[in-house]
Amino acid sequence: MLLSGGKPPAQEWFMVQTKSKPRVHRQRLQVQRIFRVKVTAFQSRPDTPYFWLQLEGPRENTGKAKEYLKGLCNPELWKEVRYPPVLHCAFLGAQGLFLDCLCWSTLAYLVPGPPGSLMVGGLTESFTMTQNWLEELVARLRWGPAPMITPRGVWETEVTRAFGALVWIRCDKYAGDLLQLPPAVQELLLSLVRDAAGKEDIIEWLGHFGISGTCPNPEILICLARQQKESASLVTIKESPGTLQEIGALNRASENSKKTTSSGAAGSLTQAQSPPAQETADQLARDQSNKQGDETNSVGEEGTATQDTSSQDSENPTQALLQQKQVPKNEERISLLLPVSALSAYTSWKVWAPGTAFGPSWPGTIAATFWKINELQSLHLAWLLSQACLNFPFWQRPTGPIQLKLPGRNPLPLKLEWKQKELVPLSSAGSPACRPGGDLGRETALKHSPRPEIPSKIISLSVVPGGCGIKEKVSPGLLQVGQSSTSVGDKGISLSDCKGLEKPFSLALSTEQGGSTAQERPLAQVPEAPTVSETLQVATAAEVSNVEHPPTGEGLPATPKVPTALKKPAVYTEPTAPKVPSAPTEPAAPATPTAPQTPTAQKTPSVKTLAGLQTPKVQSETIATAGSEVPKAPAASAVAGPTVDVAQLLSEVQASKNRAIMLKVQGKPGRQGFQPSSTVPSRSKHQFLKEGLLGAWEGSQRLSPHSQGTNIVTSFQRYNEALNTPFEMNLSEEPGNPGLRRVVIDGSSVAMVHGLQHFFSCRGIAMAVQYFWNRGHREITVFVPTWQLKKNRRVRESHFLTKLHRLKMLSITPSQLENGKKITTYDYRFMVKLAEETDGVIVTNEQIHILMNNSKKLMVKDRLLPFTFAGSLFMVPDDPLGRDGPTLEEFLKKPNRLDMDIGNFLKVWKTLPPSSASISELSDDADAEPLEDPQDVEEAGKEEGSLEEEPGIPKPDEEDEQDTNPVSVFGVECPSFSEEILQCLSLHDPSEGTLDIDLLPVVSSPYLDVPWDGKAPCQQVLAQLAQLNIPSNFTALSFFMGFMDSHRDVISDYEDLVGPLHGLLKQKPDWQWNQEHEKSFLALKRALVCALCLSTPNPNLPFYLEVTVSQVSLTASLHQEHSGRKHPIAYTSKPLLPDEDSEGPQSGGDSPYAVAWALKHFARCVGDNPVVLRLSYASRTTVDNEAWDSRRASKAWLIRWSLLLQDKGKRELELSLLQGLLGENQLLTPPSSMPRVFQPLPPSSDLSTFICVHVSGYCFYRDDELCAGFGLYILSPTSPPVSLAFSCSPYTTTYAHLAAVACGLERFGQSQHPVVFLTHCNWIFSVLWELLPLWRVRGFLSSDGASLPHPSLLSYIISLTSGFSPLPFIYRTSYRGSLFAVTVDTLAKQGAQGGGQWWDLPKDVPVPMVTPHPKGRKPNLLALQLSDTTLADIIAKLQAGQKLSGPSPFSSAFNSLSLDQDSGLLMFKGERHPRVWVVPRQLRRDLIFSVHDSPIGEHQGLEDTYKTVRLLGWWPGMQDHVRDYCRSCLFCIPRNLIGGELKVIESPWPLRSTAPWSSLQIEVVGPVTVSEEGHKHVLIVADANTRWVEAFPLKPYTHVAVAQVLLQHVFARWGVPIRLEAAQGPQFARHVLVSCGLALGAQVTTLSRALQFPCLMSSEAYWEFKRALKEFIFLYGKKWAASLPLLHLAFRASTTEATPFQVLTGGEMKLMEPVWWEMSRANIEGLKMDAFLLQLMRELLDLHWRVAEKASEKAENRRFKRESQENEWSVGDQVLLLSLPRNGSSAKWMGPFYIGDRLSLSLYRVWGFPVPDKLGCVYPSSLMKAFPKHDTPLSLDVEQ
């Protein structure tokens, strides 16, 4: 093969993974079509996971196809791209041309979704190119048209004309939308096509390019047969949703011709749309759209792709047409089928019309094509057509032939008819056209798609050349490309020439049935056969219907839509019979308005039949199938018309009866799996005259040859006479009884019984449906096989099926034709499955239960409802299951399946042999009775009541009373489950004394009248269920699964639980029962017991929790009490492993951790309701005095623990408690209940209808002065874009952002359109969406009680949003570098630099009442001094007027000491310093910390720290103390340490200090159970002085990991301890401290000699905690790491010692629950201390200002107070965080991050760390520093 240039095609080879083979196979045809290459796959060796692909074609094409396939098989990106929905036509219009061109250009895999959505996949470069092209397309959408007088306007006019011509060539239902696009968009689309076509001729390129497989079926057919001379033309304009042929095929058909095909093809298009035809085309389309509504058809993607690239297309499809159709030399026939929306799956395309003329308007390759269009000389024909007919109104248009003088030699008689076309059901798969060997089977059939029920009324215009010998219109079919000249399509006729129209239709039929050599394709639009009497031959003109053909490969075609419009009555004529007035039309659906009729179709003469009988009125609402061969018979005329031999027809009637009798002898006609082909109505060449559509025989009389001469009454005669009685199925709209079962009707059985086993009487089905509808049933389903819907004269009154299908009550089972035999799917399977899944009954007379397997035989037998007909009455028995069974009322009522199905299951189980083989034998204790085998159960069951044996008969009253007792299973007073039930549900062997059971309540089934726990089953049923052993054979397992499957609705995760057992059923010969099957078996039984025994929790009642902990197991039960009884809610039991001493858990039943575990385990059931604890004690083997004493102590502890657990706020600590905090020690508000200020923008919203306000703020420092501003960029649907820039008060960047939002709210508060605010700052989005509602609830206060910044602005925003209805929307844009984001950022910078207007809060804005309430109490300065013995002695000396005796640190400064006269405080007055307070010993270190480590000092040097501390107080040796503290500060290293400098690790504590945190003990425990986060070890940290213990999970067990935990949670607040004991040894402790210095950035680290590292001799301080930790990890399993705070809470509550805060301050301060839950104890105590120090500093500053003697001293005091407040960090400030190393690297600063909440001066909650865009963890200020201030403009809202 050579290419056009004579070059051989290039080949590309590359490998593809085998897993991508299905994807490549699906896209192979599309790749070949778009890239015009040949794709061949070669399988590699079987052991290799890949295969080879060969691409053959032009080098450029193969390269592009290779890149496309790479992205298809291994997509680097696969995302959804959104665009305005108005551009949806650009991707689906022009028959997918633009989408394919875009795929060619970008090499991306494109899948159009709903309007406004496009899935783009492939390589990154392809995705980016597609995204850029879409952005340009969207941008051009907003370009308006240029004035015509400008060069741009002239250019756009030319572009519009060229685009219109291209759209006309590739016309489809999106043509109107495409022509309404702006010229700029059209230009971009044309450029896309031009680039894809390259240098190739556009028409030839379009022919090669083909039709897209992603768009609906192309709806244009151009058939061209050129001759040497051009003269008169035959133009047939008709709607054709049928087969298609690409324009490119015409080029290949005319390669031997000297003239190009493009000219002719384009010319035919121009003929149909001349300038005067523009208005007529609009009118035609408008009339059409009004009548057909949204009824559409579609062709699937696969079918279209296969059709375009099939092997048949590789041949020349037009050569056979040109050879068979011998057209006269002086004529040229051009068939142009007007594009309509009959095949589209979407709404009708909009009315459109191209430009007035197509001229040489656009340069390039397309211009040449459009120039050829204007060269044609056929415009006169289209103009004459528009002037002759289409300008008249619909009801005034002529219907007779119109003589027009055209450019040809002969005048053309023109006949126009507008007729109603109706939808018909799917064609039968048994028709010859759909046979595998048939002609039509070679093509891909049209795919079915659902359509509305509004009937389609389509205008059909036909122009026939004169002189053809046709006097009347005779079934004008569709000219099909590639079909035989005499072939009749599935419903249409192809005419070869004028003479062919004169031939009888029977010849065409026989030719078609005999098979055609040409390739045929099914047509979706066909004429409809008339309704004909069985005794007559000739029919009147019938109507035209649409039909769809399913693909031959499909086994179950989709259900068709059935029309509701009224049809004309069937009227029969005889050549010699006189004319009589026509019978009135009898509507089938009165509620449906009658469609307008043409004048000639309103009245039709009616005649008598041969027997002299009156032809009955019939309803012709019919269903057409694919079995009919000819859709339309020639119209009968009083002047001329073909005659048919009546005797021949009558003989055929008798033959059909004989064949029916033969079928009856062979088997029941309604149930034939394989049926002979003789039943297919294709026996005679006149068969099309007699059958037509399904239902053509309804209402007609069947007369045998002997009926004319005898008066014998037959059953068939009585049946036909009964059909004369009108019957209308009237289904009222009254609501039915929801307590009735679903009715599944066997349509074949009912129809054949009513039709005397000879006719398929649809009236019988309608009677059955009407009967059950009147009884109150609303869930009715009728099953009918597909082959019963084909055109068969035995099918009567099929309009009933039409109505049932429209009401969604008819289900059609699939069937097919194989070698002339009907193969019908076993429709019993469908009926049984539906009845099983919906608990319905089956209405049938067939004994289908004998055909079912054992698992469903019993169920089916009890669901069959027999019936019969008594004349016109449908009757069912009153005792469907026999006289001993339930009544009809009970049978049709939804039963409580529990009692009945359990009884049935037990009855079957009793008949099975005993089972002995199981993995774990179920046994009782030694003294218990052995379990009964099934035989014993059966004998005992015979003596029991009839509840199990006969579910329909009630038991005696006393038994009913016992069975309905809700607690009969457990006994009246027994609070627990029976031992038998528990033992049969345990995964462990019950003989070991431990059970592993977990029973939780299930959701009540919506299919039952009463909830599952409304009526407890009898105790006997549960006892027998508990005794069922594990099944040991296939039969027992089948029964068990059948029983469980009937209760699958109440078993959660049923499919997962039953999966192993399903797999075992498939291994019937290889029965291997293993542990997995046993677990599945027990899990299913456990789930069913939960449904039987557990009650639904009542949220209005308290819960009772009982926990029992023995040495080997933990048992917990949850129940509620009402009506004097206990109702179990949940139950759990699990084995426990013994500890090292083999004594079980810590203290038996009083284990607080067991209670905590049980409470958390039942949290889903308990919710927020109160829980009453009922604890049990387990017996001990030996009880010594110490244990007894500890038991008494633990009992007192249990009292406190129970009170703790009953506190609702404490139990909610398991949740994420950061949001919704109301205040100190108050309940938490869930986020869902907080009133929102904004609402999120719904996904897939159309922003074109919103007022879009893009906001941004900007802030920078200029000459140490803060400048701020913001910008607004507004897009409105009613006005052009607006850009605004403002300057605002110099606050922070957060204030600038919020001011932008407030300004936008002010401007659009009264807008009629919804408003959406768009921001690319994640912090502002979080503030507006999450934090602002929380701040409003908390009174605009932070967690430490301080006022939030800018409360007036926050309150102003809330007040503005309250005036919106609905609330304004908010949306966070993901792309910061987008055009709108850059624009609004530029506006914000312009405003900050003073280039915009000034904005400030209105003066009348009310200021919210914000009352800061600092944490802690006001410190007593005198009491603090008196707590220091040295200061108390000095105060006493001064009060007594004495001097110090003996050595004292205050001896040298005693003369500077004095007492304040007002307060009695000890004060110090130094030289050149103001008078200050003397600091007691216990507060000196903390006072230095508050100055040095807090944001006020930010780890300043020695001098600055000393000056600041000197303003707050004095003590002897103060300067040395400050120097030692600064030298030992670890966190000054990353700020002040110079590279290479030595860092000595020192402790700020004295050598023999007994203060808290000065002496620590650490131990690493593990490895333990791996947590979900991957933690394997636990670090225990204990304070030997305060007995404080805490645990931290560790992932890596390294020195650096331990150092990191200590730095963040202990050392950051309390410094390095003077004494560090490690259980791993002194060397481990030394390495930990060295790692601290190295982690913080020190190059060389040494340890001070003062530090002590003794060996840990005793772990008494945390021995109890370590013991509890092991038990806690075992109870919580893999979730222990996330639940450690619960252990801390429980252990802290049990301690009686004073807390560190009490040791330091002598008081206790309450904290909010989130702090207790999320923070370590060291940080919690540090938080308390920070609150105390803050109050202390404020009190000291007030004291010093009051005692100041000079004005300068007061000024210095106020300056320090003001600077300290300004330097404090607040919410919204930006900081940098010191990220500690994790893999041995040094620490580094990260950020900036926003402060989301302030807990104290040294503890903050950071937003965005460690989880982006979320309120993160608590961080100490020692590991934070302020974001640097720059002199140059710098945006402070930089994200991390």
From Swiss-Prot:
Which key words tag this protein in UniProt?
Membrane, Transmembrane, Transmembrane helix
What is the top-level taxon of the source organism? Eukaryota
Q: Which terms in the Gene Ontology molecular function aspect does this entry carry?
A: nucleic acid binding; RNA-DNA hybrid ribonuclease activity
* Region described as Disordered: 249-327, 427-449, 545-564, 574-615, 918-968, 1125-1149
| Extent of Low complexity compositional bias | 582-606
The annotated regions of Basic and acidic residues compositional bias extend over 284-294
Name this polypeptide is given: Protein NYNRIN
Which lineage is the organism of this entry classified under, starting from the top rank?
A: Eukaryota, Metazoa, Chordata, Craniata, Vertebrata
